[in-house]
Amino acid sequence: MNARLEGLGITPQVLLDVFDTPVSFHRCLVPVTGGVTSALMLSQAIWTTQSLEPCADGWFIRSQEQWTQETGLSRWEQETARRALRRSGLLEERRVGMPARLWFRVRPDAVWRALQAHAGASYR
């Protein structure tokens, strides 16, 4: 590591503590979803779906706070991304229970069709 940074007390461990856990997403979803924010949210939803039991039928619960913790997206960024994903048919939502909790489900068939359409348009 740079001696100047170490002289300031900035060690690799300090950087890891400050930077926290990185957030990744599937870049191929950016043109399909219309932006990085929506691509990040859809990527996180796809990742979450992979660990579900078959009986869940693809549905999972996420609170606004959980989305923020997992992705770093603010409430307004989440709402904008969710709206875009719903409109494009890539993500379904439903409210269930009292008090109502928000459930999500990725539509893999719609994601696949959107990826194919984008790939086809890229090679024309």
Protein language model annotation of sequence segments:
Residues 27-32, 90, 108-116:
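Short alpha-helical interface patches
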Residues 1-66:
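Short recognition helix of helix-turn-helix/winged-helix DNA-binding domains
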Residues 18, 35, 93, 116-123:
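Long, compositionally biased, intrinsically disordered segments
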Residues 49-105:
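Winged helix-turn-helix DNA-binding recognition segment
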Residues 44, 96, 107-109:
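Generic beta-structure capping elements
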